[in-house]
A protein has these predicted regions:
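Basic, amphipathic "hinge/linker" alpha-helix immediately C-terminal to the N-terminal HTH DNA-binding motif
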Residues: 6-10
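A broad, low-specificity signal marking well-ordered, structured residues that form hydrophobic/aromatic
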Residues: 4, 47, 76
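A short, surface-exposed loop/turn module that caps and links secondary-structure elements
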Residues: 33-61
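Enriched for short, Lys/Arg-rich terminal
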Residues: 1, 15-25, 29, 60-66, ...
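Short acidic/polar alpha-helix capping motifs at helix-coil junctions
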Residues: 11-12, 29-33
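Nucleotide phosphate-binding site architecture
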Residues: 11, 50, 88
């Protein structure tokens, strides 16, 4: 079991997703799988990131709603969540 750690920006991103009317149960389902270290279904399209996000992974909650995270030792680091443009057009 991993211990989740939310970055400050992740908390702000969650609030933004809630305001957009996203179904937060989908995010909680993904987080539960990650915390329990269970394999993710293919539908999440989980993959490693490159460039400035090297060392992190990206999982798709919906086609244009992503979670960026990293597993380090016994910790699940939750970095960002949002759309492709929220996360990569900065």
């Amino acid at each position: 079991v991993l211990t989740p750690r939310q970055h400050g920006q992740f908390k702000r991103d969650v609030r933004k997703s809630e305001k957009r009317g996203k179904d937060m149960r989908k995010l909680r389902t993904l987080l539960a799988l990650l915390i329990e270290e269970k394999p993710l279904p293919e539908s999440y399209r989980d993959h490693p990131l490159k460039g400035s996000w090297a060392g992190f992974r990206d999982a798709h909650i919906e086609p244009d709603w992503l979670l960026i995270y990293r597993v380090s030792d016994d910790e699940l680091q939750l970095a960002r969540t949002g759309t492709h443009s929220d996360l990569f057009d900065e």
